[in-house]
Amino acid sequence: MELHRGRLIDHVHLRTRDLEAAKRFYRAALGVLDIPIEIADDHVWADELWIDAGEQGSHVHLAFQTGDRAMVDKAWRAGLAAGGKDNGAPGERKYHPGYYAGFLFDPDGNNIEVVHHGPAERSAASVKLTFG
């Protein structure tokens, strides 16, 4: 079985009822993963993730991949410290051998997963798109 990243999902758009709380949460959680994040007055943008304000928040499951188990632990703790709520401490899951993940609810109740897939062979770290 092969898993491919970067060919199915173009972007994820989350709506938040509290943009300032979302900014704190995602700045902390994604900062640990060394993902560049743009924090603007009216949005948060990090690679395929776009977050802006709305009257109703989104309710989705969103998983961020990491390079190792220590990053899962660190991102999970950072998310908790920034207002996330525990939805499953980091640990082995039964999804496939080596699947190590922690789960948090963000300030709007979205189920945020931080995952390391264990030993896996990658053809590339990511696909890079440039415009203009």
Predicted regions and their residues:
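Short beta->alpha transition motifs characteristic of CBS
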Residues: 97, 103, 114-121
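Short glycine-enriched loop/turn motifs at secondary-structure junctions
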Residues: 6-8, 55-58, 96
